[in-house]
């Protein structure tokens, strides 16, 4: 029997890579999409799968539309990737972030509990829940201390998933994913901001790159690797929570160096520090310990940061040269 999966946030970076993986595994893939005037499906087109997905109208803020999508798709698996996922924007849109990233998870879990209790559920949690770090490396037992409305909303989504698993016996797992990037990353995220700027500077269309805290350290991986961990979680007999990370941390400054060196430039000639890009509360270091995911799921990242950044720079060079 063909397995069916419902993916929220299917037009985002992770949703597109996950949809491609599921299609390759023979799934029938349903995507929850809100009606938007702007073109939101460009990532699915980039991967050549836009026409292979069954789209369901819905909005995570609207419980009724979420219920309709679950009933119509009759999925064996639901992957909740829908989110207002940019930390910086959550300071300007704290209520919207809370509704979508927090309350929206409850809408989906409640729909599964009522109408499809055998469905397996994946919740996209985030390393931003750790925030003000309480340990050198963060694992599944590290205390949470979120430092942004985004982190707080995601923590609600994480704990309501645990609550429904323990209270109602749902097969509901959370992946606590550390930063993961790709050529499909939104331009508002620092990695794409850097690789896009590198391409424009190399092609003579931009003179400088302005950033905030370049000493912040992040554990960066490739989104295409990380969606495999999501799928593996829902293939386990027992639902659980897993940190998904590389276990290696790099500063924003060093990431800039990798990107500029790929096109034969010195980042110090172009990087300018701009106080406007500093946040009200910064998370200085995020470093994940993926030992549990490696042990239980057999998952390991396959793409190094150097390979990832080079891949992104090359993609942006192609994009910018076509403009």
Swiss-Prot record:
EC number(s) from the headed UniProt entry: 4.2.1.47
Pathway as given in its UniProt record: Bacterial outer membrane biogenesis; lipopolysaccharide biosynthesis
Keyword NADP recorded: yes
Keywords in alphabetical order: Lipopolysaccharide biosynthesis, Lyase, NADP
Active site (UniProt): 126, 128, 150
Residues binding NADP(+), per UniProt: 11-14, 36, 59-60, 81-85, 154, 180, 185
Recorded catalytic activity of this chain's protein: GDP-alpha-D-mannose = GDP-4-dehydro-alpha-D-rhamnose + H2O
Keyword ATP-binding annotated: no
Gene Ontology MF annotations: GDP-mannose 4,6-dehydratase activity; NADP+ binding
One biological process term in Gene Ontology: 'de novo' GDP-L-fucose biosynthetic process
Cofactor annotation: NADP(+)
Highest taxon in the source lineage: Bacteria
Quaternary state and interactors: Homotetramer.
Recorded family membership: Belongs to the NAD(P)-dependent epimerase/dehydratase family. GDP-mannose 4,6-dehydratase subfamily.
PANTHER family given in the database record: GDP-MANNOSE 4,6 DEHYDRATASE (PTHR43715:SF1), GDP-MANNOSE 4,6-DEHYDRATASE (PTHR43715)
Function: Catalyzes the conversion of GDP-D-mannose to GDP-4-dehydro-6-deoxy-D-mannose.
Full protein name: GDP-mannose 4,6-dehydratase
Native source species: Pseudomonas aeruginosa (strain ATCC 15692 / DSM 22644 / CIP 104116 / JCM 14847 / LMG 12228 / 1C / PRS 101 / PAO1)
């Amino acid at each position: 029997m063909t397995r069916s999966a419902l993916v929220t946030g299917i037009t985002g970076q992770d949703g597109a890579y996950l949809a491609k993986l599921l299609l390759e595994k023979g799934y029938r893939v349903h995507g929850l999409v809100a009606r938007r005037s702007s073109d939101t499906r460009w990532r699915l087109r980039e991967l050549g799968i836009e026409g292979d997905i069954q789209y369901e109208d819905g909005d995570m803020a609207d419980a009724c539309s979420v219920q309709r999508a679950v009933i119509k798709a009759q999925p064996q698996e639901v992957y909740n990737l829908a989110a207002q996922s940019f930390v910086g924007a959550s300071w300007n849109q704290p209520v919207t972030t809370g509704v979508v990233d927090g309350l929206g998870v409850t809408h989906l879990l409640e729909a599964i509990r009522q109408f499809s209790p055998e469905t397996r559920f994946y919740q996209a949690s985030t390393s931003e829940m750790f925030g003000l770090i309480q340990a050198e490396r963060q694992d599944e037992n590290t205390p949470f201390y979120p430092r942004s409305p985004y982190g707080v909303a995601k923590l609600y989504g994480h704990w309501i998933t645990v609550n429904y698993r323990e209270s109602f016996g749902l097969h509901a797992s959370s992946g606590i994913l550390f930063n993961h990037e790709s050529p499909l990353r939104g331009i508002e995220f620092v990695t794409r901001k850097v690789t896009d700027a590198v391409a424009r500077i190399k092609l003579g269309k931009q003179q400088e790159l302005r950033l905030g805290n370049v000493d912040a350290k992040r554990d960066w991986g490739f989104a295409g690797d990380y969606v495999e961990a999501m799928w593996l979680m829902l293939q386990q007999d027992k639902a659980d929570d897993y940190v998904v990370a590389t276990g290696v941390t790099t500063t924003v400054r060093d990431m800039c160096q990798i990107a500029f060196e790929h096109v034969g430039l010195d980042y110090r000639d172009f990087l300018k520090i701009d106080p406007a890009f500093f946040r009200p509360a910064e998370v200085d270091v995020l470093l994940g310990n993926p030992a549990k995911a490696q042990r239980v799921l057999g998952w390991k990242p396959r793409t190094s940061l150097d390979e990832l950044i080079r891949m992104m720079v090359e993609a942006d060079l192609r994009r910018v040269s076509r403009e």
